[in-house]
């Protein structure tokens, strides 16, 4: 969270909104956008975004070491393909990543 504040992606006075009693940040779409922007601004040559992050899935997609307890490779997304393609979220993520990558290129 401090890195997001340092990059100007999260206001310092809002840090408390994202902290839980367990010390693990509470995920919100706003926090997710800040994280995507932060990653896109990195100097990494490759950046990938999981479709689960685009559609806002909160359950972990793959739990290593499980077989029958967790259907790792049979999970369905909560949105269908049309909702993903024609919804606003995919274009928002593409915009955040494009803007971040352009900033990274200028560094």
Language-model features, listed with the residues they occupy:
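Catalytic cores of glycan-processing enzymes that make or break glycosidic bonds
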Residues: 1-107
């Amino acid at each position: 969270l401090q890195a997001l504040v340092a990059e100007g992606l999260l206001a310092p006075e809002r840090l408390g909104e994202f902290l839980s009693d367990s010390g693990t940040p509470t995920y919100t779409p706003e926090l997710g956008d800040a994280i995507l922007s932060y990653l896109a601004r990195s100097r990494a040559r490759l950046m990938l975004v999981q479709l689960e992050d685009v559609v806002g899935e909160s359950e972990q997609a793959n739990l290593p070491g499980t077989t029958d307890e967790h259907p790792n490779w049979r999970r369905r997304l909560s949105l269908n393909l049309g909702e993903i393609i024609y919804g606003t979220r995919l274009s928002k993520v593409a915009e955040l990543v494009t803007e971040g990558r352009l900033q990274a290129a200028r560094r």
